[in-house]
Design a protein with these regions (language model features):
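Karyopherin-beta/Importin-beta family HEAT-repeat alpha-solenoid scaffold
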Residues: 1-333
Length: 334
């Protein structure tokens, strides 16, 4: 990456070869990375006495960043666009990139332990305000860059791989990672005022419902978050389902046993309140405010002082709920 930044013209003619070599090495290293960090609990981000990184996760991170940078090179784009013309979503190189991204975007054992005991850390990662740049976040960025260049093929490629993933015997981490990558892509769509197509949006509904019903809290939380993101970026495509998704999130706040899921549902409420018409959200204003108030009342206020991201999520969701109809909020005060 440093050589490329200093001598871009020198590396540009070789960018296609470098891209292919990087992709190949990432594919070869994936089983080792999965064993060390996703199935086992190897220590990551280690440096030697000279401050030089030497653990595998650093190499993966550099190669994912370099692969993303190569996607902007004209020789790489020309070759990949030509290949894509003769490919279907089932066998396209875009779908293969999605497979690679999902593999490296899986929650590591270290992250699982941290997020399970501190939802504030989870929220800071979710909102991308943390300085902890990991292979998981790099995969999200890779898919975002690909989506900016090839929007429809990226959406279709991710949907195609997600279908294959959910119809197989893969564990919850891979299924969560596929929805995480989608969530990152939808977040970028929201930022640039872009929408996902109705057919693709509908194609994810069954995976979201499946995720919401699973015993693993991380997959369950991801299902609620993606349901909100998809509602926000799909226009009217999910209008008939959005109310039930909103109500499911509202019901899970007091009833789900996982604090991670409860907080994810509170965050997802923001997406619904921003996207759905007043006629849908107004009848639910009081229940939403009550759910947030009850969640807050059950927390240790001394611990909340150190949970900035959690407090921001609570305040922003409460703000959006109040703005539905400020007259009702005034009545609640008195």
């Amino acid at each position: 990456m440093r050589i490329r930044s200093v001598f871009p013209a020198l590396l540009s003619p070789q960018s296609l070869v470098l891209f292919q070599a990087t992709w190949q090495e990432l594919s070869l290293l994936e089983p080792a990375y999965s064993l060390m960090y996703i199935h086992e609990d190897r220590q990551s981000r280690l440096e030697d006495a000279d401050g030089l990184p030497y653990t595998l996760d650093f190499l993966i991170l550099e190669e994912l960043d370099f692969m993303q940078a190569c996607l902007r090179a004209p020789p790489v784009r020309a070759q990949l666009e030509q290949e894509l013309q003769n490919q279907t979503p089932e066998n396209s190189w875009v779908t293969q990139v999605m497979k690679l991204a999902v593999a490296y975007a899986q929650i590591t054992t270290e992250e699982e332990g941290l997020w399970d005991v501190d939802v504030n850390v989870f929220l800071s990662e979710e909102t991308s305000v943390t300085a902890n740049y990991t292979p998981r976040t790099a995969c999200g960025d890779l898919v975002i860059k690909l989506g900016e260049w090839l929007t429809e093929p990226t959406v279709n490629g991710l949907l195609t791989y997600t279908r294959a993933l959910y119809s197989g015997s893969e564990g919850w981490k891979a299924k969560e990672a596929a929805l995480y990558v989608l969530n990152q892509l939808l977040g970028d769509f929201q930022d640039v005022d872009k929408q996902i197509g109705p057919e693709a949006a509908s194609g994810y509904v069954d995976f979201i419902r499946y995720a919401m019903q699973q015993p693993d809290a991380f997959l369950r939380a991801r299902g609620y978050l993606v349901a909100g993101s998809l509602t926000r970026t799909s226009g009217d495509a999910l209008q008939q389902l959005s109310t039930s998704f909103l109500e499911a999130s509202l019901q899970a706040i007091p009833s789900d046993e996982s604090d991670l899921v409860q907080v994810s549902c509170i965050r997802a409420l923001q997406y619904y309140l921003q996207a759905l018409p007043h006629a849908v959200t107004q009848p639910l204003q009081s229940p939403i405010i009550l759910a947030i108030s009850n969640y807050l009342a059950a927390q240790d206020m001394s611990e909340l002082n150190d949970s900035e991201d959690l407090m921001i999520t609570l305040v922003e969701t409460l703000r959006d709920a109040i703005h539905i109809d400020t007259r009702i909020w005034t009545c609640l005060l008195y």
